[in-house]
Structure formats: C-alpha cells, structure tokens
C-alpha cells in the first residue's frame, strides 16, 4: 500500500528479530521521540488519529523515521479513545550514516504538557482571515490577499514545527498557502544554503529528510505531487556570512512570492499556479532563522518585502513588546498585528551542530539518491573544468560514454563579507567600488526588474571563481541558475579590486536569478582540467550560469 507522503517498506531494511512494541497515547497528549541517524524507527498507527506537525498519519501503514526529534500528537477525541501505535527500532542500513561518530540513543516518552490547543486556535484564526480574503474581491474580481504570517523567535523554540503545522492544517481546510523558508541552514524543497518559496497543496512527506518532500528539480518529474519551489541562492548556512546578500535575496524572493499571489509569471522558472485565486487567498507562512532584536533591520525588510500582516513571536514576551514599539506605525495603520505564542514544552533545546550537519547531509543525499520509498538514479559524468580564459560556447548533452565539453561554463561564488571587507582595507585611499548605476553603459535605466533604481556594489554579493580547482570545488554543492550564459561574449573575470567586467544589466540578471537545481562536484582533476559531477537525473547539462556554495558534501 502506498499513500503520497506516507510510504510502506520495500524490504530493503536490515532484518531485525525484535518484536513490535505497542504504546497507547491518550487524547491531547504527545508521544515524544528522538531517533538517532544510526537507527530507523518503524511505526504503524493501529487505532485512532495521530499527527506529526499537523500531518495526519495513515492507519495501518508502516512509516520509517530516522534522525528526528519530534512529538507525535493525539488530538482530542469525542469518545476519549486512546490512539495506539506499534513501533520497532532497527539498525539503519545506510552505511554512510553508520560511519558517523554519532553517540545519541533512541528516547521516547509520553507527555500531557503541550501547546497544541494554542496552535489550533492560531490556525483557526488564520483560517478566518483566509475566509475574509475570499469574501473580499478586487476590482478585477480576484480574492483579496490572504494572511501573510511571519514566525519569529530565538533558538530551539519550535518555529519550523509551527510553520509545518500551520501549513498542514491549512491544506486540511482546503487552502494552498505559500511556505517561505528564510533559514539557510535548512533545505526546504531545495538544498541547504538557499531560501525558498513553495505553494503547498497536499500533505508534507514526513518520511523525507527534514519532513517536507521531493521537488521536480530532484526527480525531473512534473508529477502533481512534486513541489515546484522558487529558490534563491545564498550559498551559506549562517545569515551573518553575508547579511547584504541575504536581505537582497529576501527582497527578490518577496517579488517572486507576490507575483505568484497575483498570478503573474515571475521569471524564476517556476510555473504560476493555475488556480492563483486559491493561492492568493491562502496567504503565506514564513519560517525564519533564530532572530533577536539585534536583527531588527532584517526583520523589517521581511515585513516590507512579503507584506507581512501577522507576526507570531514564539516564547519571548520581551521581543513581542520591542517589536510592537518598533512597528507601532504599522499597527496603528491596521496593517500589522503582533501576537505571542508560548513555545511547546516538548521543544528539544540541546540540538548540537553535528545533528544539524547530519540533517543537512541527509537532505543532500536524498536530493540526489532518493530514500527508501522513492529511489532516484543520479547521473555521474565528467566535464571540462571552467577556466578564466574560456568563452561561452554551446554545451553538449551529458553522456555516460564521454566527457561533456563545457569550456563555456562560468562559475561564480557568494562573497564572504569578512573576506570582502579585508580585501577592501588594502585599496588606496579614495578608490571607489564598481557600482550598478541607475544608467548602465548599455542604455538601461538601472531598474531592478520591479521599477526601482538600484545603486549597489555587486562585489559585496558575487565574484567570479577565477581559478576553479580541487581546493575550492572538491566535495562541494554548486547551484545551476536559470540565467543562460551569454553566447558569443568574452569571458567574465574579476577586474581591479575584484570587480566583475560585465554590463550593469548582466549584473542585475545575476543578482535576480533563481536556482534551477544543483550538482555535486565530487572530485576535480587539476592536471586534466576535468571535474567529476553528480546530477539528479540524466539530461542535457544546462548552458546556464553556475554559483559555487560553501555547502560541502561527501558521497
């Protein structure tokens, strides 16, 4: 039996002779579990209703979870019947996981302390705002914009779990909200190091790494169940690595999201939902990295770029008060409301960096190889190493029998702010930076695609990777953008003080482009000038601009 988002076993697990253990979960209680990566938890709901982050678990279907710390919630029932689960712990057959130095063990316990009643009330309040949006019509006959919800808070408060729950409850009630992920540590329908926005119209896949699901960029499939995200490259896991690039990508993601709500093609390569009225009234749920009031400038940008009208502050009364003061003008205008929600008593507050890194590796591994339920066939090939002297030329089809000629490829990299500032410190006094001006040399108006003039230094965002080699590309993730290479043009290089000798129009295109997909560079042969890469599926290697990220991965 197979249900989208909930797959049965396929017999590939390591055999285990242990018997299933049964546990009874009272209504309005949580069964809290922590499953290490070296183990697999096989479980089956045999009676009643249970949820993981708002996604209802099917009865009598075996599920598999690994590397998770989460609660399984039993909603209140009229007859007060206990839900029942059978579970068994087995060794994870994934050898790459077994080779890790993880020392965590499986833990589980029941608790009647939960904030789910507050979460349900919040979900119903948001749904009431969606209904109001459906009832209100624009001059064009469209629904009004639905609620745009921003979830804020510090570390280990359950922001991501809340975002998943609100999205899942919205889908249950017939809505299709846009889930926006602004935490580059997570790969939400994308890989770590990215920001994404995805229309959610069916259940999240709790068995997938991070508990989201597959995308068409992974499988090459246009299956209805595959999500089609808008993905912006950031290239780092930590926002502080380049705050300017981060806020600029939020701005561009905001344009894409609002275009999607308007039913306008946004140029990102993501298809506009045919039923944009439903998406429009369903609104937006925004998940964020840990923020404090020191990050207010970023928070303010998010509120403006995504037209946020409801901020949910998790577990921090002081932050709620400070935000109310800072955003008083919006509150008085009636365009913004700020509420505080108590954090779940079951939030795990000892998640270490190693667990986060292993979760990232699982996300990347699943992107290329799939999981126990959906097996993917990643494609390995060898291509020419880009060089600073290469000119744009036609790409060839990826073939297992020969290397792909890719001498026209150009690889950029996201700029680490501290490295950029260090390089600027050595400039002679009075030297200016190369800026994108309001009137470029090609006669453009300097507009950034949304009618606004921009004046900024592109060197603060991207630089060309002038000397691609094993030291800077081995075991790395590279983003393939939607931006085509310029055919017949001369090569792009870093000029004086790292400037890019390309037109202002081209620089804007680079800054505004979205991510089509990813490749993994497993090894670079510096002598032969070749690099071995892994693609999610066979096909024509895109003749598009590439951006190297700081996200590493070993097969």
From Swiss-Prot:
| The keyword Nucleus is annotated on this UniProt entry | yes
Instruction: Tell me the InterPro entries matching this sequence.
Output: Clp1, Clp1/Grc3, Clp1_C, Clp1_C_sf, Clp1_N, Clp1_N_sf, CLP1_P, P-loop_NTPase
Q: Which Gene3D superfamilies match?
A: Clp1, DNA binding domain, P-loop containing nucleotide triphosphate hydrolases, Pre-mRNA cleavage complex subunit Clp1, C-terminal domain
Please give the Gene Ontology molecular function terms for this protein.
ATP binding; polynucleotide 5'-hydroxyl-kinase activity
A single BP term in Gene Ontology: mRNA 3'-end processing
- Subcellular compartments: Nucleus
What residue spans carry the region label Disordered? 431-451
Keywords, A to Z?
Answer: ATP-binding, mRNA processing, Nucleotide-binding, Nucleus
Q: What is its main location?
A: nucleus
**Matching Pfam families, A to Z?**
Clp1 (PF06807), CLP1_N (PF16573), CLP1_P (PF16575)
Annotated Gene Ontology cellular component terms: mRNA cleavage factor complex
Task: Specify the signal sequence span.
Answer: none
Q: Does the keyword Nucleus apply?
A: yes
The entry marks the following residues as binding ATP, namely 30, 69, 156-161
Function of the molecule: Required for endonucleolytic cleavage during polyadenylation-dependent pre-mRNA 3'-end formation.
In the record, the note on similarity to other proteins reads: Belongs to the Clp1 family. Clp1 subfamily.
Complex formation:
Component of a pre-mRNA cleavage factor complex. Interacts directly with PCF11.
Protein name as annotated: mRNA cleavage and polyadenylation factor CLP1
- Organism the protein comes from: Lodderomyces elongisporus (strain ATCC 11503 / CBS 2605 / JCM 1781 / NBRC 1676 / NRRL YB-4239) (Yeast)
Organism lineage: Eukaryota, Fungi, Dikarya, Ascomycota, Saccharomycotina
